[in-house]
Amino acid sequence: MPERLGLVARTRSAPGVLNKLTGVIAAHHGDILSVDIAGAGTPDARVYFEIALLASPSALVADLEALDVVRDVTVVDTLQMIYGKRIIIIGGGAQVGQVAIGAISEADRHNIRGERISVDTIPLVGEQPLAEAVRAVARLPRAAALVLAGALMGGEIAEAVKEVRAQGLLVVSLNMAGSVPDVSDLVVSDPVQAGVMTVMAVADTATFSLDRLKRRKF
């Protein structure tokens, strides 16, 4: 079974650095699960990898550090291990805040028992900004569920919801005007309860399952 590990390579900022790093990882049969670059354009860039690796990481680290563009390499805990699954809450500020109360309170219960769930929020208004934000959630690392919190959402936002659901993202909507509730996985009237149920739906330490529900609107 491959081990999932995190690596931070401190490198020079230059064209072709990522190509050299990934070439070494491929030579060690590492499967790159995630990559992020911090400090690009500065003298010291930091390239973070999450890799599935069958062998010990020591040989991989040594070969990476042998590259002329690499200053040093550190093995770190993965962001999956530290922050875990992400709940993304988008919409009107008042509703987002109430959903966050429920989500954070429920996540606390599961994280105490060894789960890792984090909660991200962004208050937004307007059909186009909201639709763009919904589509972007599918590109966020470790995003497990999206909660749409507002009084009226439809049109392009509903189309965006269909797209991200087709990519496997769980979408929960408050009971609101517009077509978004009609295309979401779960509709909840109370915002605090919406946050609670979303966390329960993604937590490995919970017995709650959407597949066992006889209805999807509460």
Predicted regions and their residues:
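A conserved regulatory-domain signal marking ACT and ACT-like small-molecule sensing domains
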Residues: 1-90, 96, 106, 121-125, ...
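Conserved mixed alpha/beta catalytic, RNA-binding, or beta-rich assembly cores of soluble enzyme
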Residues: 73-76, 81-209, 213-217
